[in-house]
Amino acid sequence: IELAKKLDAEIISADAFQVYKYMNIGTAKVREDETENIKHHMIDVYDVDSNIDVKKYQEDARKILNSLLLKNKNIIICGGTGLYIKALLYDYKFQEETLNNKYDNMSLEELQKLLPKDSLVDKNNKRRVVRFLEKLDNGIKSEKSNKLYDFYMIGLTKDREEIYNKINLRVDEM
């Protein structure tokens, strides 16, 4: 919020749970009294029983992002879900799921043999291996090479104990 004030920026949340109304415990949503008149987007947008996925987030958050850019506003994208951030900022395309995926009945070991030797995919995560192989099949380049916006990415970390202390404090305040 301090940075947003200094930059005259608005904030877009990229957290997969802050987008839901009434999910206040464990999500570290900014409270209205904490915003200091800084506009926050993509918080409390959907009902908890809505079926929201990263594609829907991408569509809705990009509308906000593009609208703010047209107004020449500075923007801070803040939050916890790397996939949501990538989907928002990169040319991240979603394929329609196929009912008869040729990789469905293959074991992880069989799939690993199909990977190029220099691939950086997590070879122990079957879902990621399958997704990588599907991209190879369809000639899809890595999203990271296709930035849609000019941006700086800053990652912040905290000591694990400090994180847990803050979580406990928030729970106690509720």
Task: List the predicted regions and their residue ranges.
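Phosphate/pyrophosphate-binding catalytic cores of soluble transferases and nucleic-acid-acting enzymes
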Residues: 1-174
